[in-house]
Structure formats: structure tokens, C-alpha cells
Amino acid sequence: MKRSLLFSAVLCAASLTSVHAAQPITEPEFASDIVDRYADHIFYGSGATGMALVVIDGNQRVFRSYGETRPGNNVRPQLDSVVRIASLTKLMTSEMLVKLLDQGTVKLNDPLSKYAPPGARVPTYNGTPITLVNLATHTSALPREQPGGAAHRPVFVWPTREQRWKYLSTAKLKAAPGSQAAYSNLAFDLLADALANASGKPYTQLFEEQITRPLGMKDTTYTPSPDQCRRLMVAERGASPCNNTLAAIGSGGVYSTPGDMMRWMQQYLSSDFYQRSNQADRMQTLIYQRAQFTKVIGMDVPGKADALGLGWVYMAPKEGRPGIIQKTGGGGGFITYMAMIPQKNIGAFVVVTRSPLTRFKNMSDGINDLVTELSGNKPLVIPAS
């Protein structure tokens, strides 16, 4: 869309020759050329074993990969290489929340207790309940992880649904829900449980019906097949077995591929061929400003979190960089990052497998710089001499 509009502008300018002298116009670069300038630096700077990068800029889609799918195999990641998206799972859980909101199944301010299993207890703080919007914005006052997990366990297999609701029955909140932001994986697993209970369907069925099947995401799952496990990228450091990850159903358990994540990301971005989803504004709406919190914990990994949405984190414009809405992830030897400038129809998804040298910030800084340059990539009029 962006490139076709720019082309129209060039034609219009070229036709105005009777009154004014033609003004030379420099064409914008292809997105692929800009991506190529950054991708090498992102890969080598992150210290990754392997990397896959998907970028959408209006009508342009770019895929780049580096390194190996497994240490020593000399095979580059492909669009159908299986990856763990880790905490980007939370964006899909929030998407499910919006879909059920629009269907009238739940409300943002519904208390979690409304959708708890029979006989379960949900803690409050001086009578203030945990609501669904608290779970989706890291403002529930629940801990990042449920206490008591065994050391060195495989990722995304604990706590199970039964274990987390049992823990909740004795948990105590140390702050009022909504008063502070503190990153919580536990909260998103409880949110997925609540959405399943509200709908009367298993969450995996909802996930397929509402998200993966409509978008054609055939390799996005919690229960990978033998073929998908063979395609799973393996990190040099921190690799975990290819198990079902239903325990982390709302927080981090999703397996996917770069190709599927491109399909998922496209729903937020318009082009001549795709229309931004009519639910995208609600999925990316900002709920809280940072100034509303007494404390912010664990939200600033790729940059200062200026506002929180439903799973999404917003970084306000700063020092020439436009506002970016983003989400980070990591686990099982993978680190992931998605960054978007939706109003410019620009988005990037990157996944890397870890080595002992891997650094998240080098990766996220590179992606932030990449989408920033893409957003400023427009034709320039050079004044006639």
C-alpha cells in the first residue's frame, strides 16, 4: 500500500510541468535492502546459534535467516522451521480475550473468581479483586512464577492447571491489583484457564477455532507432532525437550514457525493485499500509562515501557525513534521479539537460538533501529538548483 501510494505521488508530481519546474525525487529503498543492512549486525551482535527474521513493510515481505537450525548441522532456518515463540504466546492469549469480549462471553472487568473452577479460591487485596484486565496487563499483583518449581526442569511444563489453582487457594497478594505492574507468567496461564471456562470449551479448541485455523497457521500448536519436533530448532545453550506445553497454555507454550508468525503479524498491518483486522485496534489498545503505577517490575527489557496494553508494551517516541509497540519472549533456548509501528504498516518478528554469548538487548536494539529506519523510508524531494 505504501509503495503504491508513493508511486502515485511520483506520477502526480511528474505531471505538474506547465507551471513549475519538475522537482527531482529520490525513490525510497526497498525494504529488503534495509533489512539486509541490519540483519547481519542483529545476528552477530546477539551471539545466536541460529536466527530467523520476518519483516513486513506495507506490500513488502522479507525473510532472512542465519546460522544453523541445530549446532553443527550447517542448515539455515527456513520459513517452516519450528520455534518456540515463548512469551509472545501472551499476545495470542490477549487476542483470545478480545475475541471473547467481542462475542459478549466475558468483560474486561470481570473478576477472575467468576471463571474459577468449582470450589477454588482467588485472593483479593483488602477486597479489591483480580480482574481479567489485570491478568492481561501484568497488574494482578501475582508473582512472575509460581513458587516451588523443580530446578532444571524442561520449560513450559509446570505448573499444570491443577497445580496453579491449588497454589492460588493459599496465595496472598502484596499489593492491590492495578496499583503496580509486575511481569507475571502465572497471570496469563490463569487468564487462558478463565477464557476456557467462560466459553465452555477446552482452550486448545478455542485456539484452533479462533486463531490458528482462520489464519492458516498449520504449524502453530502446543502439542507438536513427530514431524514438527524434527523441524524444531535446537539451541547450543538452554535447549529443552520437544514436549507438549499445555501447562503454559497462556504464558509461553506456543510452538510456531517464521511463516506462521508472518501470517499472524499481518493481521495488524494493512497493504494492497491485506486489511488490518477490525479487531486489531482493540487488541493493541493501551490500558495503563506508566505514571499510573507505584512500581514497574520486569517490563523494560527492550526499552522503557511507557504504557501497557493487553499483552503488548508501548515505548513512546524518543530521540528520533517513533513509538513502537512490542513484546519480548524467551525460554527453552530461544529468545523472541516482535516490534511494530502499526500506523506505518511496519512489523518485525525475530527468533534466535541461544549460545553462551547470546545477548537479548543487542537483538532488540537492532530490531528497534530497523523498524525505525523503515518508518522513515519515504521519497525525498530535492530542491531544483
Curated annotation (Swiss-Prot):
Q: How is its activity regulated?
A: Inhibited by cefmetazole.
Q: Enzyme group, top EC level? A: hydrolase
GO annotation, biological process: cell wall organization; peptidoglycan catabolic process; proteolysis; regulation of cell shape
Give UniProt keywords alphabetically: Carboxypeptidase, Cell inner membrane, Cell membrane, Cell shape, Cell wall biogenesis/degradation, Hydrolase, Membrane, Protease, Signal
What subcellular locations does the record give? Answer: Cell inner membrane
- Which Pfam family is one of those matched by this entry? Beta-lactamase
Q: Mainly localized where?
A: membrane
Q: Which InterPro entries match?
A: Beta-lactam-related, Beta-lactam/transpept-like, Beta-lactamase-like_AB/R
Q: Which residues form the signal peptide?
A: 1-21
GO CC terms in record: plasma membrane
Assigned EC number: 3.4.-.-
| Any GO MF annotation of the entry | carboxypeptidase activity
Mutant phenotype after disruption: Disruption is viable and exhibits no overt growth defects, but produces morphologically aberrant cells, particularly in cell filaments induced by aztreonam.
Describe the function of this protein: Hydrolyzes the cross-linked dimers tetrapentapeptide (D45) and tetratetrapeptide (D44). Removes the terminal D-alanine from muropeptides and disaccharide pentapeptide M5 with a C-terminal D-Ala-D-Ala dipeptide. Associated with recycling and remodeling of peptidoglycan (PG). Also displays a low beta-lactamase activity.
Q: Which PANTHER family match?
A: BETA-LACTAMASE-LIKE 1-RELATED (PTHR22935:SF95), PENICILLIN-BINDING PROTEIN (PTHR22935)
Q: Which family does it belong to?
A: Belongs to the beta-lactamase family.
* Protein name from the UniProt record: D-alanyl-D-alanine-carboxypeptidase/endopeptidase AmpH
Q: Which organism is it from?
A: Escherichia coli (strain K12)
